[in-house]
């Protein structure tokens, strides 16, 4: 049970998969460490007071991706792809990977300064927040990334009330209103 969860959001993201172990990698060499790319949903539990991203983003079903990897050689320009998402067939997000705040080589270089990356590690590149909205039990999430394909995920379990959309500064309920969801 995650206390004080008011709403869950799913953010459509472009993610990359590491090909080999990486530590202290320069930006110039970083793309040599990329094996391929996957569609990725970054799910967040909103409404709780956060001390870190671990609890609101780190639940075991909160990072559905794949189910396939498109290899790096199939995507000559990872910064020129459209990312789209739908919830129950309703369009939610539509943005270009060219709008990413941090490029892949920058992300690999920065993360590898602080931790050892391993083959198969998946790093999501972030999202464009326009169109993000609540998700609930029974919903179907879809993500499509140009040249990578389209994936579908289903939400099961309990979820917060459908009538709440928490925004910063709003009053939060005194009691928890939701329990974890599972995305399959």
Regions found by a protein language model. Give the residues of each.
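Short, basic and Ser/Thr-rich N-terminal targeting/leader segments
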Residues: 8-12, 33, 63, 79
């Amino acid at each position: 049970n995650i206390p004080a969860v008011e709403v869950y959001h799913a953010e459509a993201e472009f993610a990359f998969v590491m090909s080999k172990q990486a530590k202290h990698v320069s930006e110039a060499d970083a793309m040599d460490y990329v094996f391929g790319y996957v569609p990725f949903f970054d799910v967040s539990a909103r409404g709780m007071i956060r001390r870190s991203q671990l609890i609101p983003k780190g639940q075991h079903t909160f990072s559905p991706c794949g189910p396939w990897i498109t290899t790096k050689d199939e995507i000559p320009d990872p910064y020129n792809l459209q990312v789209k998402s739908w919830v129950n067939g309703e369009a939610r997000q539509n943005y270009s990977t060219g709008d990413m705040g941090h490029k892949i080589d920058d992300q690999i270089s920065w993360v590898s300064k602080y931790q050892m990356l391993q083959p198969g590690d998946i790093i999501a590149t972030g999202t464009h927040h326009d169109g993000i909205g609540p998700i609930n039990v029974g919903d179907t999430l879809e993500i499509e990334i140009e040249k990578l394909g389209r994936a579908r995920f289903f939400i099961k379990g309990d979820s917060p009330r459908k009538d709440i959309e928490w925004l910063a500064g709003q009053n939060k309920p005194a009691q928890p209103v939701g329990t974890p969801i599972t995305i399959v």
